[in-house]
């Protein structure tokens, strides 16, 4: 256990940020899974709207520093390729 006041504060701040990051990552994974299910069902209209949501979630998580921007770009590219392959 930390004895120094600033170390105690850092523990609290880290716990808050960890919780926030978990929430954002969970929402991101859910959005991607919903898109994947729509692609598997071969539902192009639903997949297109879910792609927009997944891309938005990826951009938001990258801008907040939860995931790396290159990882977000790579995932968006792969999701777009899956969407375009449905045509």
UniProtKB/Swiss-Prot annotation:
Q: Which GO terms describe its biological process?
A: translation
Ribosomal protein as a keyword of this entry, yes or no, is yes
> Does the record carry Disulfide bond as a key word?
no
The record's keywords, sorted A to Z, are: Ribonucleoprotein, Ribosomal protein, RNA-binding, rRNA-binding
Q: Name one GO cellular component term.
A: cytosol
A GO term, aspect molecular function: structural constituent of ribosome
The UniProt entry, under InterPro entries, shows: Ribosomal_bS20, Ribosomal_bS20_sf
This chain's protein is named Small ribosomal subunit protein bS20
Q: What's the source species' lineage?
A: Bacteria, Bacillati, Bacillota, Clostridia, Eubacteriales
Q: Which gene encodes it?
A: rpsT
């Amino acid at each position: 256990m930390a004895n120094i006041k600033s170390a105690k504060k850092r523990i609290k701040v880290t716990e808050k940020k960890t919780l926030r990051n978990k929430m954002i990552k969970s929402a991101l994974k859910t959005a991607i899974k919903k898109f994947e299910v729509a692609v598997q069902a071969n539902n192009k209209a639903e997949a297109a709207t879910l792609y927009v949501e997944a891309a938005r979630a990826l951009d938001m998580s990258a801008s907040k520093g939860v995931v790396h921007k290159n990882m977000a770009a790579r995932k968006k590219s792969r999701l777009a390729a899956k969407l375009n392959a449905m045509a």
